[in-house]
C-alpha cells in the first residue's frame, strides 16, 4: 500500500504506438483550462521532493521535418525559431517579427492540421475562416513547404502499394482501406497513413528515452522516480538533493534518444505540484 493514486499504461492501446492510460486516465487531464489546472494542482510531490516535467518541443513537427526533408521546415528547427511564427512568416509573406497572434494561431492550425490530414472544412471550423479561405491557406502552405506535400503524397502512394505504413524503427500499421472504393473509408485510411509514421515515431522516441533514463537512474542508484508519461512529456518525482543531477540527465538523454536530421528539443519545468510547474 503506497497511499498514492496509480494509473495503468497499455503498450498496445492505440493504433500509432502511443501509450494509453486508464484506471484512471491521467493523460487526459486538461492543461489549458482552469478546471484542468486545479485538478493538476492536487498532484503533489512527496516531502523533500519536487516534480520535474520534461516535454519534447514540437516533436511531431520535427519528425515531419526529418521525413519530408523540406528545407524551410528543417531550417526553422535548425535555427531554433518558433515554428508557428516561422510558418506565419512564410504563409503571410511578412518578416517573422511582424507576425501577430492571429497569424500565428492560423499557422499553428495549419502545422498540426497537416499531420492529421485536416481538410479545408476542418481548417475553417478551427479558425473561423471560410472553407474557401481554408483551402487557400492550405494551398499556400504547401507552396511554401513543397517538401511536405511531396512526402505526404509519397506516403499515400507507398501505402497503396504495400498496404501498410511504418515508423522510423519499422513498426507497421496495416491499412487495407487505403484502396477502398468507399470515399469515406479511403479518406480515413489516407489520414491514418499520414499520421501514423509521424505520431508513431514520436512514440518510439519517448519510449527509448524512458528506457535510457531509467537505466541511468538504476546505474547511479538514484532515488528519483519516473511517475507519469503524458505522450510527449515525462514527469518525475525527484528528491531536492537530486534535482540538478536529474535535470542534467534528462537534458542529455531525451534529445539524444534517436538521431534525426533536425535537433530534438526538451523543455524542463519543476515545482511542488503538477499544476504550477515553472
Segments and roles (model prediction):
Residues 1-278:
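Conserved catalytic core of nucleotide polymerization and phosphodiester-bond processing enzymes
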Amino acid at each position: 500500500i503506497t497511499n498514492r493514486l496509480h494509473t495503468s499504461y497499455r503498450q498496445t492501446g492505440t493504433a500509432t504506438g502511443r501509450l494509453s492510460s486508464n484506471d484512471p486516465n491521467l493523460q487526459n487531464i486538461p492543461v489549458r483550462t482552469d478546471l484542468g489546472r486545479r485538478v493538476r494542482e492536487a498532484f503533489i510531490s512527496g516531502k523533500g521532493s519536487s516534480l520535474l516535467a520534461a516535454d519534447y518541443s514540437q516533436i511531431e513537427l520535427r519528425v515531419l521535418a526529418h521525413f519530408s526533408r523540406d528545407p524551410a521546415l528543417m531550417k526553422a528547427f535548425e535555427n531554433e525559431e518558433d515554428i508557428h511564427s516561422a510558418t506565419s512568416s512564410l504563409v503571410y509573406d511578412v518578416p517573422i517579427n511582424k507576425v501577430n497572434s492571429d497569424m500565428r494561431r492560423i499557422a499553428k492550425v495549419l502545422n498540426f492540421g497537416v499531420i492529421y490530414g485536416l481538410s479545408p472544412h476542418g481548417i475553417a471550423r478551427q479558425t473561423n475562416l471560410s472553407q474557401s479561405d481554408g483551402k487557400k491557406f492550405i494551398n499556400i502552405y504547401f507552396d511554401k513547404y513543397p517538401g511536405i506535400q511531396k512526402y505526404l503524397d509519397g506516403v499515400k502512394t507507398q501505402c497503396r502499394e504495400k498496404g501498410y505504413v511504418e515508423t522510423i524503427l519499422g513498426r507497421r500499421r496495416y491499412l487495407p482501406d487505403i484502396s477502398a472504393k468507399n470515399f469515406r473509408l479511403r479518406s480515413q485510411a489516407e489520414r491514418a497513413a499520414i499520421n501514423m509514421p509521424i505520431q508513431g515515431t514520436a512514440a518510439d522516441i519517448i519510449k527509448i528515452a524512458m528506457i535510457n533514463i531509467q537505466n541511468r537512474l538504476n546505474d547511479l542508484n538514484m532515488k528519483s522516480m519516473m511517475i507519469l508519461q503524458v505522450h510527449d512529456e515525462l514527469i518525475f518525482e525527484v528528491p531536492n538533493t537530486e534535482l540538478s543531477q536529474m535535470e542534467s540527465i534528462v537534458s542529455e538523454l531525451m534529445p539524444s534518444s534517436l538521431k534525426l536530421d533536425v535537433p530534438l528539443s526538451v523543455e524542463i519545468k519543476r515545482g511542488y505540484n503538477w499544476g504550477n510547474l515553472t
